[in-house]
């Protein structure tokens, strides 16, 4: 896999990182629209959410969105040396596997990430920017998937 174009990633992330919760909510709303079976995996204090809107307005889930956006921020910060995040990302993979997330769902997360970036950036979300983010996300998922394979 080619290395992502660092400057395209950083430049586009600057716009997103100004409002991470807002943009992260767009990402997860899209994720639940594409893969509604993921909604039951999100439970806090034994509370089952009745709808994506219910989940997306929950303070506990908003905290999860913040954490996801911090992981993306770490990947952007380390875009030229993602190996420095290898152990952390593999451990995230293990955690996601333990709660029942399927590895195949990360493809839908990637689609949702690209959707959010396109909505945030508008015309600045060029084909080159899309390709750079696809490469970065692919590398992150590759590292996380190692968590599925290890105990």
Swiss-Prot record:
It comes from the Eukaryota. One of its GO terms (cellular component) is cytosol. GO terms for molecular function: GDP-dissociation inhibitor activity; heme binding; metal ion binding; nitrite reductase activity; oxygen binding; oxygen carrier activity. PROSITE patterns: GLOBIN. Phosphorylated during hypoxia by ERK1/ERK2. Phosphorylation regulates the heme pocket hexacoordination preventing the association of His-64 with the heme metal center. Thereby, promotes the access of dioxygen and nitrite to the heme and stimulates the nitrite reductase activity. Phosphorylation during hypoxia is stabilized by 14-3-3 proteins. InterPro entries: Globin (IPR000971), Globin-like_OT (IPR050532), Globin-like_sf (IPR009050), Globin/Proto (IPR012292). CDD domains: Ngb. Keywords: Cytoplasm, Disulfide bond, Heme, Iron, Metal-binding, Mitochondrion, Oxidoreductase. Residues 1-149 form the Globin domain. Its EC number is 1.7.-.-. It is found in: Cytoplasm, Cytosol; Mitochondrion matrix. One of its GO terms (biological process) is response to hypoxia. Pfam families: Globin. Heme b binds at residues 64, 96. PANTHER family: BLR2807 PROTEIN (PTHR46458), NEUROGLOBIN (PTHR46458:SF19). Belongs to the globin family. This is Neuroglobin.
């Amino acid at each position: 896999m080619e290395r992502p174009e660092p400057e395209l990633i950083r430049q586009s992330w600057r716009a997103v990182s100004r409002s991470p919760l807002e943009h992260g909510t767009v990402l997860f709303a899209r994720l639940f629209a594409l893969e509604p079976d993921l909604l039951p995996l999100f439970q806090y204090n034994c509370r089952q959410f009745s709808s994506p809107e219910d989940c997306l307005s929950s303070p506990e889930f908003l905290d999860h969105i913040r954490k996801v956006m911090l992981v993306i921020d770490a990947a952007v910060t380390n875009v030229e040396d993602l190996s420095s995040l290898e152990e952390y990302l593999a451990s995230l993979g293990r955690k996601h596997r333990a709660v029942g997330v399927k590895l195949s769902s990360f493809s839908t997360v990637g689609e949702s990430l690209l959707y959010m970036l396109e909505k945030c950036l508008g015309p600045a979300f060029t084909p080159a920017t899309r390709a750079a983010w696809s490469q970065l996300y692919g590398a992150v998922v590759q590292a996380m998937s190692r968590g599925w394979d290890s105990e």
